[in-house]
């Protein structure tokens, strides 16, 4: 099989963005992100494997389009309403880095999801992410501005002296304090095993969490890696035309 035939696409379809991952076989070679309202288009006769985790419209069904479901992710003991993105990220983390493992996915919602040494779901937590907390203050107060987050900016002072810095301080310091508490509890239960940070805000949070644990890693593409793993398990190998 040629390298061109091995190229395929994975997509994580959310509420606000679609993240594309170009693969050559099992290797992730390129990642792109587009607004969710933009119509999905890709080269003809290219496999597309989708994880729909939001309300954005999906492409029509075709032999080239595969929409993954929670039941296709070989994570042990998931509950029925577990988010597909959480399951894919956790399973990908476990098979790539080892079990037990904990994934902190810092997206629109920030989630913590953990599995034990057998790859069985332990459970997790969901809370508003950095952007959602900032947006809530801007939307539901009369005079507080909407603040933006810069991964390269220093952590704001705890006792800020202007409104924007005070908002960043309140959100970031309380979020980090909560994550420290969750990580400490996880380590009491599972003293060994990797901890993974992923998601759009993970780049900002990771430097502040990294000193807490030697096994903490940053992997921005866990959900795409999970899609690739499921493709390996479930894809139908097409025979060349005329083959018996």
UniProtKB/Swiss-Prot annotation:
Compartments where found: Cytoplasm
Residues annotated for substrate binding in this entry: 79, 83-86, 163
Keyword Metal-binding attributed: yes
Ligand binding (ATP): 12-19, 108
EC class name: transferase
Leader sequence segment: none
Primary localization: cytoplasm
UniProtKB keywords: ATP-binding, Coenzyme A biosynthesis, Cytoplasm, Kinase, Metal-binding, Nucleotide-binding, Potassium, Transferase
Stored InterPro entries: ATPase_NBD, Type_III_PanK
BP term (GO), one: coenzyme A biosynthetic process
CDD domains documented for this protein: ASKHA_NBD_PanK-III
Cofactor details (free text): A monovalent cation. Ammonium or potassium.
Pathway: Cofactor biosynthesis; coenzyme A biosynthesis; CoA from (R)-pantothenate: step 1/5
Cofactors named for this entry: NH4(+); K(+)
Reaction equation(s) it catalyzes: (R)-pantothenate + ATP = (R)-4'-phosphopantothenate + ADP + H(+)
Positions contributing to K(+) binding: 105
Entries under PANTHER family matching the protein: TYPE III PANTOTHENATE KINASE
Family membership: Belongs to the type III pantothenate kinase family.
Task performed by this protein: Catalyzes the phosphorylation of pantothenate (Pan), the first step in CoA biosynthesis.
Protein name in the entry: Type III pantothenate kinase
Organism this protein belongs to: Synechococcus sp. (strain JA-3-3Ab) (Cyanobacteria bacterium Yellowstone A-Prime)
């Amino acid at each position: 099989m040629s390298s061109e035939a091995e190229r395929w696409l994975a997509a994580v379809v959310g509420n606000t963005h679609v993240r594309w991952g170009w693969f050559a076989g099992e290797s992730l070679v390129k990642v792109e992100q587009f607004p969710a309202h933009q119509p999905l288009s890709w080269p003809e006769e290219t496999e597309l494997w989708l994880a729909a985790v939001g309300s954005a419209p999906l492409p029509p069904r075709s032999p080239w389009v595969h929409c993954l479901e929670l039941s296709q992710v070989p994570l042990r003991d998931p509950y029925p309403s577990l988010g597909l993105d959480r399951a894919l990220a956790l399973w990908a983390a476990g098979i790539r880095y080892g079990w037990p493992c904990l994934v902190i996915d810092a997206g629109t919602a920030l989630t913590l999801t953990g599995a034990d040494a057998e790859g069985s779901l332990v459970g997790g937590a969901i809370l508003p992410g950095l952007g959602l907390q900032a947006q809530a203050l801007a939307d539901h107060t009369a005079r507080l501005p909407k603040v933006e987050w810069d991964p390269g900016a220093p952590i704001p002072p705890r006792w800020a002296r202007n409104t924007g810095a005070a908002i960043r301080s309140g959100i970031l310091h309380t979020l980090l304090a909560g994550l420290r508490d969750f990580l400490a509890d996880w380590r009491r239960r599972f003293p060994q095993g990797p901890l993974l940070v992923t998601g759009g805000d993970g780049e900002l949070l990771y430097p502040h969490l990294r000193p807490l644990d030697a096994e903490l890693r940053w992997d921005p593409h866990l959900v795409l890696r999970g899609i690739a793993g499921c493709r390996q398990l479930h894809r139908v190998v097409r025979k060349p035309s005329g083959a018996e």
